[in-house]
Structure formats: C-alpha cells, structure tokens
Amino acid sequence: MTAPAHLRVLIAPDSFGDTLSAVAATEAIARGWSAARPDDHITRAPQSDGGPGFVDVLASRFGTVVTETVAGPLGASVSARWLHDTGGEVPTAYIECAQACGLHQLGGGPTPRTAMAADTLSLIHI
C-alpha cells in the first residue's frame, strides 16, 4: 500500500520532560517531517497538561505573554509569566502557577515545611 501524495499531519506533543518544551518538540518534529515529506500539510498543536509549559503552549496560538516579579514559595522574588488574551468576549488571564510556586523554586527539594509554604497569592494579585 502506498501513501497518498499529500498527507494532512497533526503534530501535537506535550513536553519531553526537562529536555524540550511542547512548542520546541512540535517544531522539531515538524522540521523532521517536512524534510522527509515536504509536500504534506502540517498542523502544529503543542499540548500541555496545565503544568510547566502551559503559558508557552497557549502563547503559540494567541495572547500576549506578560512577565511579572512575584514572591516565590520561600518569599524570594521570582520571575513568573502569564498570558493576557484580549481576543475573546472578555479579557482573560491564563496563569501557570508552577512558575511562581513550582517545586523547582524550592531549591534543594521540598520538605514538609517548604512544601506548605508554596503560595499562588502573588500571581493572583497581578
């Protein structure tokens, strides 16, 4: 059986752990596919489970990324990004809480004390 001359291809990966974001993985797969089959029509749709990379996935489709300095889970200032979408009926903010209070912000790893200190309040006040 031979493949049709032109395929419609959907590329929709999530991130590859800490190695590639969903957006970067989508682009890498699309480049490889296009190199092998340049006449195919590719639709790119990076995915996210709502954790790290969520804002990047949405930003690949719509909205404006805004960077703010907020209090992290241990009280130190950290940089966090959120997506501002004004294209719908009402302006909408998409917040990736892991940027401000994710485990990576705890340094040496969570302990019962530091894990309870995680707070999303500073992101909500933006």
What residue ranges belong to the model's regions?
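Actinobacteria-biased recognition of intrinsically disordered, low-complexity terminal regions
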Residues: 1-7
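Glycine-rich nucleotide/cofactor/substrate-binding loop typically near the N-terminus or early
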Residues: 31-108
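Short, contiguous strand/loop micro-motifs
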Residues: 16-17, 41, 111
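Glycine- and acidic-residue-enriched helix-capping/strand-helix junction motifs
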Residues: 19-24
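Glycine-rich anion/phosphate-binding loops
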Residues: 112-122
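Conserved small/polar residues in nucleotide/adenosyl-binding loops
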Residues: 124-126
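Generic N-terminal amphipathic, Lys/Arg-enriched alpha-helix
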Residues: 7-18
